[in-house]
Curated annotation (Swiss-Prot):
Pathway: Amino-sugar metabolism; N-acetylmuramate degradation [regulation]. GO terms for molecular function: carbohydrate derivative binding; DNA binding; DNA-binding transcription factor activity. Keywords: Carbohydrate metabolism, DNA-binding, Repressor, Transcription, Transcription regulation. It comes from Shigella boydii serotype 18 (strain CDC 3083-94 / BS512). The gene is murR. The keyword Transcription applies. Residues 37-56 bind DNA. HAMAP family: HTH_type_MurR. Gene3D superfamilies: Glucose-6-phosphate isomerase like protein, domain 1 (3.40.50.10490), Winged helix-like DNA-binding domain superfamily/Winged helix DNA-binding domain (1.10.10.10). This is HTH-type transcriptional regulator MurR. The lineage of its organism: Bacteria, Pseudomonadati, Pseudomonadota, Gammaproteobacteria, Enterobacterales.
Length: 285
């Protein structure tokens, strides 16, 4: 679990005291080896129990476990930075050669994958896969780049026998949402979790008794609050981006994992359908 990533992405979810702790940890991560919870509490003007509760909120058993994990993450990131600092900065500039751009893009996508996979709650993921597998009907919603991810997932799911709707038109998305029933599933893909169209569809789906699964960022958002289940994605986009490249990479890693998990649940039948699909498309050549 990448605690530094969770701290930096979950700021809006923190209380005032929790934000003080988060800011302190981020600003002093290189010096945490010599910091105790008592020292932190005194410096921040809060109780030691607040620090312990903060650590537990992030998934650690206590402050000591969180502190050691942060030290380890910081050391690992320093090692990676030292090996790539000359060429792989955090943003692409107008002066970069295509070779440097390629290396930066690859590194950014690698980080998106590493950080997203590190945040997976695999027990929750298994539960989500089971819920999807039992759904009579699945709707997938998304806008822009997220819509492309959704369309790819819809094709994969249809290939193994699921009834899926993934419409590009937002009015049609809303119309489908209000017609969902209990047992149906809506998979809402939105990194920000705040797009009006996606939130509206999630509200409609939930009102009808459907299960809402959100593929979104760690930040608090209307979609995150509406969803029955969330699958977290991490991405660092920069100013020289005409498209959300690393975001799509992170989202695709989640949707591909869902697909493979569903294939595993019913492997014999799924593989037969994949084979039949391949045979049919071969006849079109």
């Amino acid at each position: 679990m990448l605690y530094l990533t969770k701290i930096s992405n979950a700021g809006s979810e923190f209380t005032e005291n929790e934000q003080k702790i988060a800011d302190f940890l981020q600003a002093n991560v290189s010096e945490l080896q010599s910091v105790s919870s008592r020292q932190m509490a005194k410096q921040l003007g809060i109780s030691q129990s607040s620090i312990v509760k903060f650590a537990q909120k992030l998934g650690a058993q206590g402050f000591t476990e969180l502190r050691m994990a942060l030290i380890g993450e910081y050391s690992a990131s320093r090692e990676k930075t030292n090996t790539t600092a000359l060429h792989l900065h955090s943003s692409i500039t107008s002066d970069d050669s295509l070779e440097v751009i390629a290396r930066k893009l690859n590194r950014e996508k690698e980080l998106a994958l590493e950080q997203t996979c590190a945040l997976f709650d695999y027990a929750r993921l298994q539960k989500i896969i089971e819920v999807i597998s039992k759904a009579p009907f699945i709707q997938i919603t998304g806008l822009g780049g997220s819509a492309l991810v959704g369309r790819d997932l819809s094709f994969k799911l249809m290939k193994i026998g699921y009834r899926v709707a993934c419409e590009a038109d937002t009015h049609v998305q809303a119309t489908v949402s209000q017609a969902l029933k209990k047992g149906d599933v809506q998979i809402a893909i939105s990194y920000s979790g705040s797009k009006k169209e996606i939130v509206l569809c999630a509200e409609a789906a939930r009102k009808q008794g459907a299960t809402v699964i959100a593929i979104t960022s760690l930040a608090d958002s209307p979609l995150r609050r509406l969803a029955h289940f969330t699958l977290d994605t991490v991405s660092g986009e920069t100013e020289w981006r005409s498209s959300s490249m690393s975001t799509r990479t992170a989202q695709n890693s989640v949707t591909d994992l869902l697909f493979v998990g569903l294939v595993q649940l019913n492997d014999v039948a799924s593989l037969k359908m994949i084979q039949r699909s391949s045979e049919l498309t071969q006849r079109l050549k």
